[in-house]
């Protein structure tokens, strides 16, 4: 994916501010974890494939400086984080994961005005419209 300079600047700024740079994460490469369920891994692949088709840069398994590892990071997209829910529910995400994200994204999530996350249910057939 050829990036415009504005997109590259957005990515650089996001990664400088939030990503743990001691871990190298290539752009537009799908990294999967054996610890995830098959449905969860397939969900991540489907989302990444749709993003790639649309020319939207993404990163998977990015370790943030706060210690959190979102499923997919999309610094130039509508929202910065895409979470694929496999065995967990929205309530489980809120109880177990949300507090690990940087404060400004938690506040945006809680305000209901601006979105920080897109959630994809791995148990349902993937529909790329949920990403846009």
Regions found by a protein language model. Give the residues of each.
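Active-site metal-binding core of divalent-cation-utilizing nuclease and nuclease-like domains
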Residues: 24-36, 45-90
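Short, flexible coil/linker elements and helix-boundary hinge sites characteristic
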Residues: 16-28, 55, 76, 97-100, ...
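Generic detector of leucine side chains in alpha-helical contexts
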Residues: 3, 11, 15, 32, ...
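Polar/charged alpha-helical tracts
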Residues: 9, 13-16, 53, 91, ...
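Interdomain/boundary linker segments immediately adjacent to catalytic/signaling cores
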Residues: 1-49
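Catalytic cores of nucleic-acid endonucleases
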Residues: 79, 84-132
